[in-house]
Amino acid sequence: MSTTIAVLTGAGISTSAGIPDFRGPDGVWTKHPDQMNVYDLDLFMNDKKQREYSWRWQKESPVWKAQPGVAHKALARLEQAGMLNLLATQNFDALHEKAGNSEDVIVNLHGTIGSSHCMKCGQAYRTADIMAKLDQEPDPHCHKPMPYQGNMPCNGIIKTDVVYFGQALPEGAMEKSMRLASQADQFWVIGSTLEVYPAASLVPVAAQAGVPITIMNMGSTQYDSLATRLIHEPIEEALPKLVDKTIAGQK
């Protein structure tokens, strides 16, 4: 029976794909703390100018042109080898999906930028369609006809499915991640500072279940003492080697 590995990824796995991290030494929020307001739910819902700024900022994000790097592709190989039971990610860039990982293992803890919803009626939208009309409608609102209002448009605020500060994680995301992390034979943390909760709590959950933990991150984390293996090397170099070695060990 093959080894099962649960993985948590953070922004560090995507920096080599051209997406800057948020909390590292050169992170967006480290250098520009005011940019955290882009993802503040209360401001977004109550301040028209903030909504417009948030939409413009997200439209200009490098996420849209980014392609998966060798580290993302390594995790796709791990799944193809039948060894990956969980890929929980704090990233909303969808690069794991682009690399070939399946919805069966991916849990987008912090949502995804590719889809959007009306905060009033729940109508779903493709974010790319909204972005294409942003010059004409800088503060996107829902146009779904409401039968009980004489087919007048809903006019609710539209927001991307990225989880904002003050917003709950997708339903069941943490429960599934905690269960699979505690059932795995190994738990790997890849490119996360482990500063954001509840995602960071997966480490002590796995540790309490007796699961060996690998933390691969350029900087130290608060949970390094729980790790059985620490790797402070560039992820795009270290992760493919670790995956290849792990797969080879099963043959």
Where are these regions (language model features)?
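Conserved catalytic core of sirtuin-type NAD+-dependent deacylases
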Residues: 1-251
